[in-house]
């Protein structure tokens, strides 16, 4: 997908870039039967109290129902369209199965309109096909990886990401998967994954250019603690541009941050991690 750079007709346009979706997107209106409504809470809970900061506003969106499970085995499907999805960074592909059922999947890199895809243990090792990990050759690039059998893919779903199947673990029940972060993890061999890398890899190269584009996405301004008052943030107060004045930077609630490890060493999933991600010292 090409990247369009705008002329500097204003400060907001200077250095702004965007993706040229017409190069890839073949259908602009979503499939009505695969849409669902979604409400936005602007980061508030049922009591109206803010539980997540920097959320609110943004364009209204309709949720596209994505098939992360891929359990319709041995029924071939044809890719009818590649569509834009405002709810995720990756594009989505509209599939029409041989029995007439329609569904959306995350569009892998290289998948085109007219391609045939299939799921099941006997499916070919081909981009877009979904198989149990035990049926995939070692070294294959995969995405949309399940963590629990039948729950649907949870890992590696963002634009441009991919994982690699490395081999069997000591226990025959598990296989080793290297994630895009560098983490090597044990995953049950009966879990499913989709062949190929997630498409739309140019997404990370886009320069937003102006604050308004992040507001359209439902994100509100992230204010630095050093420009707040002392009663609002531990970094606040002082005359002019004052330093933090503390041994370590703190969060708004007084907890150590910036480099402080937050993952518990007693986490029950720790036993599945063979090697931590790059830069981790846990």
Swiss-Prot record:
Residues 257-266 have a biased composition (Basic residues). SUPFAM superfamilies: Nucleic acid-binding proteins, Translation proteins SH3-like domain. Pfam families: Ribosomal_L2, Ribosomal_L2_C. One of its GO terms (biological process) is cytoplasmic translation. Gene3D superfamilies: 2.30.30.30, Nucleic acid-binding proteins, Ribosomal protein L2, domain 3. GO terms for cellular component: large ribosomal subunit. Residues 31-56, 226-282 are annotated as: Disordered. The keyword RNA-binding applies. InterPro entries: NA-bd_OB-fold (IPR012340), Rib_uL2_dom2 (IPR014722), Ribosomal_uL2 (IPR002171), Ribosomal_uL2_bac/org-type (IPR005880), Ribosomal_uL2_C (IPR022669), Ribosomal_uL2_CS (IPR022671), Ribosomal_uL2_dom3 (IPR014726), Ribosomal_uL2_RNA-bd_dom (IPR022666). It comes from the Bacteria. Residues 35-44 have a biased composition (Polar residues). GO terms for molecular function: rRNA binding; structural constituent of ribosome; transferase activity. Keywords: Ribonucleoprotein, Ribosomal protein, RNA-binding, rRNA-binding. Belongs to the universal ribosomal protein uL2 family. One of the primary rRNA binding proteins. Required for association of the 30S and 50S subunits to form the 70S ribosome, for tRNA binding and peptide bond formation. It has been suggested to have peptidyltransferase activity; this is somewhat controversial. Makes several contacts with the 16S rRNA in the 70S ribosome. Part of the 50S ribosomal subunit. Forms a bridge to the 30S subunit in the 70S ribosome. PANTHER family: LARGE RIBOSOMAL SUBUNIT PROTEIN UL2M, RIBOSOMAL PROTEIN L2. HAMAP family: Ribosomal_uL2_B (MF_01320_B). This is Large ribosomal subunit protein uL2.
